[in-house]
Amino acid sequence: MEQKENLEKKNKFILGGVIMDKVCVIGLGSWGSALALTLCKNGYEVHMWTRNEFQANEINTTRENSRFLPGVIFPKEIKISTDLESVIKDSKIIVLAVPSQAVRSVVKQIKHVVKEDQILVDVAKGLERETGLRLSQVVKEELPNNEYVTLSGPSHAEEVSRFMPTTLVAASPNLEIAEIVQDAFMNPQLRVYTNPDIIGVELGGALKNIIAFGAGMCDGLGYGDNAKAALMTRGITEMGRLGVAMGAHVTTFTGLSGIGDLIVTCTSMHSRNRRAGILMGEGKSLEETLKEVDMVVEGIVATEVAYKVGKKLNIDLPITNAIYSVLYENAKPEETVRTLMTRSKKNEMEEVVNNGFVHN
């Protein structure tokens, strides 16, 4: 009842013409744009930043992000600017909606204007290539005194921007801050849960891209539903195995940022990672694949980072290792599948068996 009253209150703000707190979105890609539309619908004063003056002028004039969200109209209340300082000033929440490899450079750029009471919300799903760090760790190195929330889950911008039913998770060790972000984004079409396990939520969002790439590769090779089901199921096991070794709670991988995001990314043509996998399964080179997808494919870097972390921690990651060999060692996709299928026999629940859990 209380949540319903809060949602109705937000709608009254809009209908009454009253604007709530200012928030800003850094980045004008598809996901940042979709979240800006959500925040605007919820009654917030939304400002977006891009360094691309042409893109800013186009959206301010035509009210459409033709590059990333064609056909979706931006309300006039959303302001687009190339002036970073004015966009950030007085914003209660700063949404970082840039590719994972750009997060550090963007945070370095904004940290001289960010105040300590502003909440940072990262929505990228990746790991930093040079350091192997999660994005919350990257941001904390640059802005150690700000509260930080990861917003993740099974969500395609193409659907969120059209206000189709979607669920997300706001993760932070500080649940009070996570609830502020939860309240900011919730509406009748977007349900947001909270989770204190930010490590697990971040890793779920990053690692599922590796498995989605593999699922796409299976499609490109012409394999059926059986192969994809096996890959997804063993993939979530692998995600949990690496996640726990990196400090996550295994149950997080059964939630929205784990199984939830894995399902949507492995099965939808909205998924860049799956599309990239399809193209490489069909025989295209990595260079040809990236040119055709023409957007950031986070799973490519995530594969490299996870492979290196797995080797360092001595974690068994057969699917990740196989995809790494395709991306970075020029292995043939069909050969890697054969290698996976002909490995030595194992128990399905290897960890359970090794811990002595056997029914009499």
Model-found features: residue ranges?
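NAD(P)+-binding Rossmann beta1-loop-alpha1 motif at the extreme N-terminus of oxidoreductases
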Residues: 16-72, 82
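Conserved active-site and cofactor/substrate-binding residues in soluble primary-metabolism enzymes
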Residues: 26, 34, 54, 82, ...
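Rossmann-like NAD(P)(H) cofactor-binding subdomain of soluble oxidoreductases
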Residues: 74, 80, 84-165, 181
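Internal alpha-helical scaffold of NAD(P)-dependent oxidoreductase catalytic cores
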Residues: 102, 113, 138, 142-146, ...
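General beta-strand structural signal in soluble alpha/beta enzymes
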Residues: 122, 147-152, 192-196, 317-319
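NAD(P)-dependent Rossmann-like dehydrogenase/reductase catalytic/cofactor-binding core
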Residues: 215-216, 244-254, 262-360
